[in-house]
Amino acid sequence: MKELPNNVIRNCNEKKLLNLKRIVLDYIKEFKLEDITWKYLTKEKMRKFLFDNYYINNNFITWNDNDTIFGMHYLQWHLYTDKYFIGTIKNNIDKETIVGCISYFNYHKIYGNVNYISTVEINYFYQGMKLLNELYKNFINELDFDKDIMITNESMI
């Protein structure tokens, strides 16, 4: 598979990078669910991970050293609620791509429902909701309500 030169990415501003969208599609690697691993975090470690690696700006969660092309749009963010689900996948241009965020709340657990953030804007590296649905199913199957959880294919903490 081709590799997009890093200097192309480093020397592009957000607008130019968006214009590379059609080209970059040729460089993405095929994503498989077995490529990811589960990391269980305490609430304190989850908050530290978020504050260390992300910032929140006008309804975007973004890597601190990147712009929103590698981020995720979301409806609402409840940092101090019960459960958090964050999926990150390593892509071919050395960026971590956020693929989903799902919040769980106590009253939803009682009624067996989930507050699913359905207006997630996945960037063009992956097939959006199709991937999120697979991650969601795996997350529910493995769900431990006593822990916060993060999915990643790399050791990030």
Language-model region placement:
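Conserved N-terminal entry element of GNAT/NAT acetyltransferase domains
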Residues: 1-45
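Active-site rim helix/loop that mediates acceptor-substrate recognition in acyltransferases
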Residues: 43-85, 90-92
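Conserved beta-strand in the GNAT
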Residues: 96-107, 116, 121
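Short coil/loop residues immediately preceding or within conserved phosphate-binding loops
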Residues: 82-84, 112, 117
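Charge-rich, solvent-exposed alpha-helical interaction surfaces
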Residues: 23-27, 49, 138, 142
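Conserved acetyl-CoA-binding loop-helix of GNAT-fold acetyltransferases
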Residues: 122, 128-142
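Short, low-complexity Ser/Thr-rich regulatory SLiMs
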Residues: 91, 106-108, 124
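Conserved beta-strand-loop-alpha-helix junction that forms the acyl-donor binding cleft
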Residues: 150-157
